[in-house]
């Protein structure tokens, strides 16, 4: 097993909370420029940030292909979509080119940035998988006020929100001024 000697470990209480602002995180964007997570890059006033594990993950390939398929439903709901991973540019580019995504994709998310997002971070099982720690999946929906409307993180690749259902739910939330849920302190 690769040991990356990560000194600071995230506590379970370091997770982002609904109703908070997404930390300001800027990463390089495929195609040039940068991508600031939580800041819409198109004519939508909401943004959904999908954090994927990386090129080594076959489930991520299926998930991003599904995101590409349902991206128009998110657009109808007024939500722009972006994806980001800790992969370097070459791996992110070959992965997304293989899938054929049209939405913005960021890369080189650092371990510190992953922690700022409250994500679970894993070490690769071998160098064949990848050469660096990577984020486990996360989905963040940021509303027009810049607040986290929806927060969904997982510690494994197998549990992720259904994208078609989420697009319909976000349309309902917007059409009905549905409040941010899960704000009561435990």
Regions found by a protein language model. Give the residues of each.
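Chalcogenol-based redox active-site neighborhoods
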Residues: 2-186
